[in-house]
Amino acid sequence: MRLILLSGLLLLGIFLANGDEVDPDRKLLNSLIDALMHLQREFANLKGSFLIVHKARSFGSGSERMYVTNKEIKNFEALRQICEQADGHIPSPQLENQNKAFANVLERHGKEAYLVVGDSANFTNWAAGEPNKAAGACVKADTHGSWHSASCDDNLLVVCEFYFIL
């Protein structure tokens, strides 16, 4: 009997000496800490990768804003909802290089798209004879980036604007 008891104590001592604790709460806590550290490393890697891609796209267009299409054709209200659901915005180029980046998307797809023009815009790119309120209350850009008055019911290429200031 003493031999069995001594063997049990010896085995328990070996487990404790190896750090294999019997406490399941402690094991769970250590496991959660390891998982959290792994997630933190993965997040840092993803953030770094995202920033590299964003900087590369910004470098190529000369704009800190990205203009992205899902290739759908929709009216202004549908565009507003789609961009909002995607955490984006209806395009609103504020600088010439932003308008060029926006126009590049339109040229690539051979389509026109809506944009919004602020009341205090420092940059505009109205086509000759525009804005023309008789043509409509909305604004569209052609494949060259020129702006035209348009009906908000026109079905145009869906393009949303995304900008990331980190």
UniProtKB/Swiss-Prot annotation:
GO MF terms held by the record: carbohydrate binding; phospholipase A2 inhibitor activity
One GO location term (cellular component): extracellular region
Disulfide bridge partners, by residue number: 83-160, 138-152
Tissue expression per record: Expressed by the liver.
UniProt keyword list: Calcium, Disulfide bond, Glycoprotein, Lectin, Phospholipase A2 inhibitor, Secreted, Signal
Subcellular location: Secreted
Glycosylation site list: 122
Residues in the signal sequence: 1-19
Family statement drawn from the similarity comment of this UniProt entry: Belongs to the alpha-type phospholipase A2 inhibitor family.
Function: This phospholipase A2 inhibitor binds directly phospholipase A2 in the presence or absence of calcium.
Assembly notes: Homotrimer; non-covalently linked.
Name of the protein described by the UniProt record: Phospholipase A2 inhibitor clone 11
